[in-house]
Amino acid sequence: MPGRNPESKPEVKPAAIRPHAKPAVKPSDVIVEEKVEVVQKEEKPVAEKITIGELHLSGCTGCLVTLADTYEGLFKLLDNYADLVYALTLVDVRHVPEMDVCLVEGSCCLDDKLSVEELKEAREKSKVLVAYGGCAAYGNITRFCRGGQWNQPGQEAFVPISEVVDVDLYIPSCPPCPQEVRNVAVMAYLLLRGNEEQKKLATAYLTPLMQLAQRGNEACG
């Protein structure tokens, strides 16, 4: 080509200086964080579950709602400690079965023969009968609904269940605390299914509630 020297060579640029390579990471320099998985171990029941029933008499169903209000506690109770075998509001069972613990809600209407018969049947078929809530234990406001008034000849008489049958435990209050209901059920389980040490623990917890039942309806719920 015109104007180009055939003997001239293209200019060669020097290679760029490479940075110093970083040394490889040694295994000893690597910190591995170990994940520790914490597993909460569920205590296994000591024996087979107990059976629990709920007899509804003259009450507002607030006590049964309290039992359901335990939520996770109720599921744990039913999974590990007790089978609910009778409760007309929750279980489709028409006749009172044999059971370990019967929770009786509401006072007993003396003029309702069916209520009186069901209460007596529950007493015969349960090992532990519990006056569940203020109405069953003391009558509460239903005690003022007594018959015999001349101006109200149709008014019915309502009494605490202890005036009809023998009661083993009282769980007072209106309504009872959900935790108290759950505790009583677990302690009844230990009392009926546990070893000697567990039975002593359950007896110590349940004794005040047994003493309330022995005193009868002299207190106010």
What are these regions (language model features)?
Residues P2, K9, K13, I17, ...:
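Iron-sulfur-associated redox domains of electron-transfer enzymes in respiratory
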